[in-house]
């Protein structure tokens, strides 16, 4: 059998796997050094008691014949979809438009497969690498990188001459940590509606938005129901990175060019390829929604980000993001190349970060810091960053 040619388009190693490998090698060679890993955006705070209690109760219920449950509905438990519609969307979205899934990555894969390979896809640059890799794996015909530069507030530069079938956006953004205003989001929705573009909006970090003057969901823009699909997840908001529970929204008003609703085909795809998310996790998510709009861990991570940002700026770095997201997008000091970025922070500060060029060509000249760690790690990182100014560190380097 011939190899699927799409896999030849992928880099030999996934970005974060490569970082883990380099970090493991450094620790092996330097066992006496304590490295603070601020590279990978995994959660660290334990689950809230209300969630673990719901998990325990559901597990016990499965021991009894009268309460045992087999398959659930492919689109998710009605009570969970209803609660998401109410708590997250303030009933702007109906439960029938919400589909419970096992994660944002699988949703991206399903969506790209759903639309088919003969499409033109616009991706932010820098972008979370999974988008680009999944686009390659699913055989998307044309992938157009859309530059997101600091001069434009890390908002994508949209093409005027070339039409996009699909436009993927992530806000609060990974990796830049930036957010959109209502006016900025309205302009992107207007573009999508004017050009017949389907806008896939990744709102996985929406729980980090605490300012009511900023949008959390694309559906806070009324016209978005004609052009947008939203992805969201419990991974960062409730600490479900290892438990896997997410959802996506397909509005009834979203149609093909023949005016047929897309939601009908999406239901068919879900029923064919997915038996539904774990009932155990759905029960956990249902009770976890009681912690919204700002689950306790979110406040802790945002405090981490604020402390880290202050220390980085005090040390002399230029920092973006971190106010409504767990990520800080830090400009590399002059004289440090992209190839040296990881080693610079690892050797000078004993801090592991993610090199920006791994997110795309427009990530060159930056690194990403993650605040999704324990407060004591942030305190130690801040101490190391402030021990010497950036100018002094550059002399040492």
Swiss-Prot record:
GO terms for molecular function: L,L-diaminopimelate aminotransferase activity; pyridoxal phosphate binding. InterPro entries: Aminotransferase_I/II_large (IPR004839), DapL/ALD1 (IPR019942), NHTrfase_class1_PyrdxlP-BS (IPR004838), PyrdxlP-dep_Trfase (IPR015424), PyrdxlP-dep_Trfase_major (IPR015421), PyrdxlP-dep_Trfase_small (IPR015422). GO terms for biological process: lysine biosynthetic process via diaminopimelate, diaminopimelate-aminotransferase pathway. The gene is dapL. Belongs to the class-I pyridoxal-phosphate-dependent aminotransferase family. LL-diaminopimelate aminotransferase subfamily. Pathway: Amino-acid biosynthesis; L-lysine biosynthesis via DAP pathway; LL-2,6-diaminopimelate from (S)-tetrahydrodipicolinate (aminotransferase route): step 1/1. It catalyses: (2S,6S)-2,6-diaminopimelate + 2-oxoglutarate = (S)-2,3,4,5-tetrahydrodipicolinate + L-glutamate + H2O + H(+). The modification N6-(pyridoxal phosphate)lysine is found at residue 236. Its EC number is 2.6.1.83. This is LL-diaminopimelate aminotransferase. Substrate binds at residues 14, 41, 105, 128, 174, 275, 368. Keywords: Aminotransferase, Pyridoxal phosphate, Transferase. It comes from Chlamydia pneumoniae (Chlamydophila pneumoniae). Its cofactor is pyridoxal 5'-phosphate. Involved in the synthesis of meso-diaminopimelate (m-DAP or DL-DAP), required for both lysine and peptidoglycan biosynthesis. Catalyzes the direct conversion of tetrahydrodipicolinate to LL-diaminopimelate. It comes from the Bacteria.
């Amino acid at each position: 059998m011939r190899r699927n040619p799409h896999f030849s388009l992928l880099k030999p190693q996934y970005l974060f796997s490569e970082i883990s490998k380099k970090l493991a090698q450094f620790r092996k060679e330097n066992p006496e050094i304590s490295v603070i890993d601020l590279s990978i955006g995994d959660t660290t705070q334990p689950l809230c008691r209300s969630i673990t209690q719901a998990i325990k109760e559901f597990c016990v219920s499965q021991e009894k014949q009268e309460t045992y449950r087999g398959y659930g509905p492919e689109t998710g438990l009605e009570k969970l979809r209803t609660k998401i519609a109410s708590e997250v969307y303030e009933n702007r979205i109906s439960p029938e438009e919400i589909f419970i899934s096992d994660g944002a990555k699988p949703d991206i894969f399903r969506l790209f497969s759903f639309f088919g390979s003969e499409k033109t896809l616009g991706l932010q640059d820098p972008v979370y690498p999974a988008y680009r890799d999944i686009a390659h794996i699913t055989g998307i015909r044309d992938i157009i990188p859309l530059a997101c530069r600091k001069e434009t507030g890390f908002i994508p530069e949209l093409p005027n001459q070339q039409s996009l079938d699909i436009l993927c956006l992530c806000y609060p953004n990974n990796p830049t940590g930036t957010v959109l205003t209502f006016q900025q989001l309205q302009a992107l929705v207007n573009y999508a509606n004017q050009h017949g573009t389907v806008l896939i909006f990744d709102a996985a970090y929406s729980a980090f938005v605490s300012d009511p003057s900023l949008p959390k969901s694309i559906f806070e823009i009324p016209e978005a129901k004609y052009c947008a699909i939203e992805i969201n997840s419990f991974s960062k908001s409730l600490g479900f990175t290892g438990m896997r529970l997410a959802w996506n929204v397909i509005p009834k008003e979203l149609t093909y060019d023949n005016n047929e609703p897309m939601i009908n085909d999406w239901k068919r795809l879900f029923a064919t390829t997915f038996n539904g998310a774990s009932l155990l996790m759905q029960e956990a998510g249902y009770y976890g929604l009681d912690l919204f709009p700002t689950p306790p861990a979110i406040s802790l991570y945002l405090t981490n980000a604020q402390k880290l940002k202050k220390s980085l700026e005090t040390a002399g770095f230029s920092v973006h993001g971190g106010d409504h997201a767990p990520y800080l997008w830090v400009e590399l000091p002059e004289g440090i190349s992209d190839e040296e970025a990881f080693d610079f922070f690892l050797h000078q500060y004993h801090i592991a970060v993610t090199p920006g060029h791994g997110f795309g060509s427009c990530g060159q000249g930056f690194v990403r810091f993650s605040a999704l760690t324990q407060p004591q790690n942030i305190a130690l990182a801040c101490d190391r960053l402030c021990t010497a100014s950036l100018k002094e560190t550059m002399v040492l380097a």
